């Protein structure tokens, strides 16, 4: 029997220390609000197995600068990176077809998004 691993909530060992989060192989999803307001997170390295990022998963991660999605992320939820004010660049595979409502709203440092498969950008996706 195969299991799906989804990160539901992230709690750092040292709340005041900046960390580089590495999700282990086998994780297929980051749940809604899993990293919400976790200012400790500086970067995220996701496994090939990741296919879904939930609503507001990284909302308010003000120190998040870099996100690495090496696999085939097909769904990124609403407000997933909202208010990630330090996020500068993010790259997705061709499997992502839609940038949902307010995905990067308030991500004021964002200057580059590579998403070659996107055919739909919903409202407020990049609103400053």
Task: Locate each region found by the language model.
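N-terminal regions of proteins, emphasizing targeting and processing segments when present
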Residues: 10-11, 77-80, 122-125
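Structural signature of tandem-repeat unit edges
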Residues: 1-4, 14-29, 39-52, 62-75, ...
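Short amphipathic alpha-helical surface micro-motifs
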Residues: 3-6, 81, 104
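Pocket-edge structural micro-motifs
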Residues: 9, 25, 32
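Intrinsically disordered, low-complexity boundary segments flanking structured domains
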Residues: 6-10, 55, 101
């Amino acid at each position: 029997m195969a299991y799906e691993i989804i990160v539901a909530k992230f709690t750092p060992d040292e709340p005041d220390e900046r960390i580089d989060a590495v999700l282990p192989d086998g994780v297929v999803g980051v749940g809604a609000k899993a990293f919400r307001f976790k200012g400790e997170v500086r970067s995220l390295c996701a496994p090939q197995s990741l296919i879904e990022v939930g609503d507001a998963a990284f909302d308010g991660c003000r120190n998040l600068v870099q996100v690495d999605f090496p696999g085939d992320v097909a769904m990124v939820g609403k407000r997933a990176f909202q208010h990630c004010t330090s996020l500068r660049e993010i790259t997705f595979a061709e499997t992502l077809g839609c940038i949902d409502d307010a995905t990067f709203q308030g991500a004021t440092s964002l200057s580059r998004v590579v998403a070659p498969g996107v055919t739909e950008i919903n409202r407020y996706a990049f609103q400053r």
